[in-house]
From Swiss-Prot:
NCBIfam families: 2a57. GO terms for cellular component: plasma membrane. Sodium-independent high affinity nucleoside:H(+) symporter; transports adenosine and uridine. Can transport cytidine and thymidine. This is Nucleoside transporter 1.1.
Amino acid sequence: MDTAPDHREPQEQGESRKWYEMTASEFYVYVVAFMCGVSMMMPVNAVFSAPAYIMTYYRYAMQDPEAVPLYTNFWNNVMTYYNLIGIVTSLIMEPLTLLSWFRRIPMKVRLLGGLVILIVEIIVLMVVPARGTSEAGAVATICCTGFIGGFGKSIFESTTYGMFGAFPSSFTSTMMGGVGMSGVLTSLLQIIVKAALPDSYEGVKKQSKIYYGLDVGIQGMTFVALILLRFNSFAQNYFGDLGAVKSKVDAGKLSAEALCHTDEHPTHDKEGRNSSSGKEVPALGEVQTAAAKSEGPDAVEESSWPHEVEGPTSNEILVATAIFSTLRRVKWMFVACAFNFLITLFLFPGIAVGMFPDSKWFSTIAVFIFNVFDVLGRFSPSLKLMWPRSYKQRWIIVAASFARVIFVPLLLLHSYHYIPGEAYGYVMEVIFGFSNGYVGSMALVLGPQSKGIDNDGKRFVAGTLMGISILVGGTIGTVLSIMTQTIRATY
């Protein structure tokens, strides 16, 4: 994948380059971004696409189709427990990825290591029933895989969001599209498999093998694609050496003038580098000494590199990046992203698609519709017309995020059948899904483009912080959903 350096005309921020204008190396990075997005959510989607298998996992683990569970409360709420363990683990682990000792780990090790852990999660779910265990062993397996999945996802997700935060925004949009496409693929496969295979003991077992096999296959391809990315010249322009060796770019400095931004979207220079002031923005292998000093005490770590040294590695630059200073600069996009996913995971899937439990197809079709329009929303930032017209109009994204609170009464009323009919539910899933994808993706794209995020080290940290915002909002939303459904079941 090693090609000559890419020279192109300036590219507007938020506008993806036409496919016929791309070099092979640039197109390959888009493919990798998409595959990373798909792989990020595949384990969770694979598990949720075969609920009958997980809810009766004890039978397969005990190798007894007639087994009667002793831990009925656990198996009645196994999906909730699995999801909650994964989210809480991610919420604890992902902020730890910003600690200096973790940032010293080469990024390629983090990417590949996180992906391997996600693959191990699915392998464990498949191996335990093959070997056999007790019901208590099955419970322990579900809890352990929830923890393993949350641990691996926190490493892979934070590194992926951070890495593509250093690229032009269209790469983040593509990655977010991959996250949504993961749900579309599993939903579509669920419809096909549900129509083709019976809901018997053996039929459900075959369904699980299809979902889990697809997951491992996609993640295996992503693993290979990430290894090849190390030799991609376009990726090296933006992300240097992936933390493997000393950067080819000499240590330099960025003048304080680079901190001054206009209200216009940043553009890219002839090599596609992000530039908002007409000056070259150094790659993630250069030193931002003057810029760090201009930020004040919060950025004291960033001034630790001498002016004239051999180019440090990418992860060394990350260690020298101030976290709280970066968080202050992305705070509004952080809040918008967190609240967006709070509303989504509060209502979806339990409340938004669970109002017709006796219907064989409503929940399946409703989830599919949500996933399709969620993907469309996630890809929408690739269109320039979907962007705020100026930097000052970024408040629109924050307002749109908080405006999504209107879905709470609309879907709760439908859930309690005060608003009857399945057609209403399908229409709501269209709007609900698109708004989730658009607001979430736009916030993730705009976060690393905030004023003061003027080098790739800060963009990496900003991208990681935006990933954490998803977990913060998602955790609160999931807890609220559990509380709401518990009250609903009680009263």
